């Protein structure tokens, strides 16, 4: 963004634009030559999912990479939502791939449920995380092209385009539910493998 103010820049899957661009009073529109889509899920809905699926859960581990500001933002918001519901949370932050396993083990030892935000390092280490949480019996809760067309055809001015969010469908991992003995809830769709 600092390299040009003339060429439209559309970001894809940026979780929190205000955080990523260090904008204190972010109102949904970046302005200038930047807009895009966010992969930010409805964090309150995710906190609700934890309490719906696991009503007996008292301690939720928040597993994330401390080097990713967008992950820290999500963790803070989910922690607030869970705290409002009377659920204790504890952060388990790894710094990179090298300490994912040890930090995940600590999270598994502490938690009734582990929450993992949209986090690049966690996503690339899904198997390592699952290999620790599953044996421990701890469950884990884990439109840009159209915008470009509007800019290129003159239908939209990028300086006035708000950040768009993808629509979410509540889903569950059927094989993981079976492995952990969890009965899927109504209103959720199984992830197709």
Where are these regions (language model features)?
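An alpha-beta-alpha
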Residues: 35-82, 162-176
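Short beta-strand elements in bilobed, periplasmic/extracellular small-molecule ligand-binding domains
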Residues: 33, 79-97
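Hydrophobic alpha-helical segments within soluble ligand-binding/sensing domains
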Residues: 17-57, 144-154
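Periplasmic-binding protein-like
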Residues: 1, 10-12, 60-63, 111-123, ...
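Pocket-flanking alpha-helical
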Residues: 1-3, 19-24, 98-100, 123-125
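Venus flytrap/periplasmic-binding-protein-like
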Residues: 7-21, 130-143
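Structural motif
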Residues: 93-109
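Hinge/cleft segment of the Venus flytrap/periplasmic-binding protein
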Residues: 150-193
